[in-house]
């Protein structure tokens, strides 16, 4: 369904579960109409129906596989549609690979880069001109504290997303366009199950709630901050990862990866 009201419109990728679904719910509560995207059309339609019924908003559904150029281009075209401008962009879609790089599937590695790096880059490039023109807009990139450690392609991709967000945040200082990196730790979502990652034995205090993660990110972004790290435990971890010797950081990253296999 196309948005027809005068409410601000937010586009959320990977919107059917986890942090993406929490962002859709949070923005709906704030009065935004939504464009939600994911690969599973049935789940998208179900989510859209629930959001419309609960919040009385317009919800547009776009099925797109961001591991393909066609899928990325579909979202780009929507972001470039200035007749129904996107006020908020949430780059959330992502997945992990539960194998070491040397034995993982090469196409899967390329897909990871498309979804976690190329898609957010192209989406930001598509939406920023209109945001700058009207001097209004928010982009939140869902990164990860994994970007601070040596944890394979996923960590490398999240490191890129964090640094790119910080760079654009600095570039846009003095405007009303906000770019923000959300860097959560372990969050209760479908992410780990889909990636077949073993999370048994992870201490309870390390788990975060998706709704609280999203609320933290939104508050921080609207205050003009470049990034947010929800949870005191992850703030401490991020601080340590930046200042302890890199050999230790590399060992922590590799040990964490091994425990998940």
Locate the predicted segments by residue.
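Conserved glycine-rich Rossmann-like NAD(P)H-binding loop of the short-chain dehydrogenase/reductase
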Residues: 30-47
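Residue(s) in the substrate-gating loop at a strand-loop-helix junction
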Residues: 144
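Active-site helix of classical SDR
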Residues: 124, 157
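Conserved NAD(P)H cofactor-binding loop of Rossmann-fold oxidoreductase domains
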Residues: 92-97
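Substrate-binding pocket helix/loop in short-chain dehydrogenase/reductase
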Residues: 100-113
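Conserved glycine-rich cofactor-binding loop
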Residues: 16-17
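SDR active-site lid
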Residues: 171-233
């Amino acid at each position: 369904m196309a948005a027809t009201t005068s409410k601000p419109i937010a586009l959320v990728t990977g919107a059917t579960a986890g942090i993406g679904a929490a962002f859709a719910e949070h923005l709906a509560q704030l009065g935004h109409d939504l464009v939600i995207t994911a690969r599973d059309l049935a789940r998208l339609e179900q989510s859209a129906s629930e959001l419309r019924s609960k919040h009385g908003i317009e919800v547009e559904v776009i099925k797109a596989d961001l591991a393909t150029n066609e899928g990325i281009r579909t979202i780009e075209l929507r972001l470039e549609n200035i007749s129904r401008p996107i006020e908020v962009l949430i780059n959330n879609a992502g997945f992990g690979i539960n194998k070491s790089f040397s034995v993982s599937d090469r196409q899967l590695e390329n897909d990871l880069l498309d979804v976690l790096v190329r898609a957010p880059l192209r989406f930001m490039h598509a939406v920023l001109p209109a945001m700058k023109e009207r001097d209004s807009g928010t982009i939140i990139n869902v990164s990860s504290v994994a970007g601070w450690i040596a944890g394979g392609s996923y960590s490398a991709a999240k490191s890129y997303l964090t640094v790119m967000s910080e760079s654009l945040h600095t570039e846009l200082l003095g405007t009303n366009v906000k770019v923000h990196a959300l860097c959560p730790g372990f969050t209760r979502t479908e992410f780990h199950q889909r990636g077949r990652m073993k999370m048994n034995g992870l201490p309870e205090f390390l788990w975060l709630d998706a709704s609280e993660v999203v609320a933290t990110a939104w508050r921080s972004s609207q205050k003009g901050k470049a990034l947010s790290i929800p949870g005191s435990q992850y703030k401490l971890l991020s601080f340590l990862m930046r200042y302890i010797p890199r050999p230790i950081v590399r060992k922590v990253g590799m040990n964490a990866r091994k425990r998940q296999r």
